[in-house]
Amino acid sequence: SLGRVETVADPYVAPTPTADDYYILRQLAARSRNAESEREQRPAEVLTAPKMYIGASASLQSMQYADSAAAEAAGNALRQLAETGAVPAAWAAEALDTAETGESYTDWDGKYYSLDATYCVTDSLGFVTVRRFGMTDNALFTRYSVTMDSRTGTVVEAWLSMAGTDAENTPLPTETALRSFAAQAGLESLGDWAAPADSPYGCALYSTNGGALITASTHPYTYQDYVGTAPVSSDRWYYSLTLQLRTEDQLPG
């Protein structure tokens, strides 16, 4: 009655959010299932470990010229990630340097590609990957790659490359910056983002509720290719920022 405080037998408890409650996590789950299905359909001898970086020369031929909307969306996404600290500002600035170089690439079949252009490819789920390429020592390499959900603009992967020692001392994002990356994906309300315990990841957040993992890393690599029949290589660094699904059992410890 009015003015009396009574104990409720079964007080309301808000349901714990799960991955199924979030569009982008449902999309990532479907993407993972598709990738697993494709791997199962390949001959066993061609299966390899996951690549540490994105190969360029094997992928450009499967892409098409990006229209201005896709190129602008990827550029804006990188700028916003740089503003929040989720992507190092210097890396984003170099990746988005749009000064025309006149560089081009001609593949083994004689097909010409302008490297002043942006390229993209879209999968059947609507994830669009936008990339820019460059040349180093006459070999093609990936300058940056951004994968977004085309319906929402949510970024799930950003990968950038920088030459040698310019990138060696890049600081990794703060926890606040990684939380901003979760927020742009609409996942802040999962409510339990935290650095995974006893994890080899130097910079990561994990949500048990969503089974979602955000990681950021930098690492040196040697880019290798061929110019004609002559091997060429270039020492570079990559920066990788990803949102992916992982159960607690799948977290490395």
Which residues does each PLM region occupy?
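Long, terminal "pre-/pro-" and other extracytoplasmic accessory regions
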Residues: 1-253
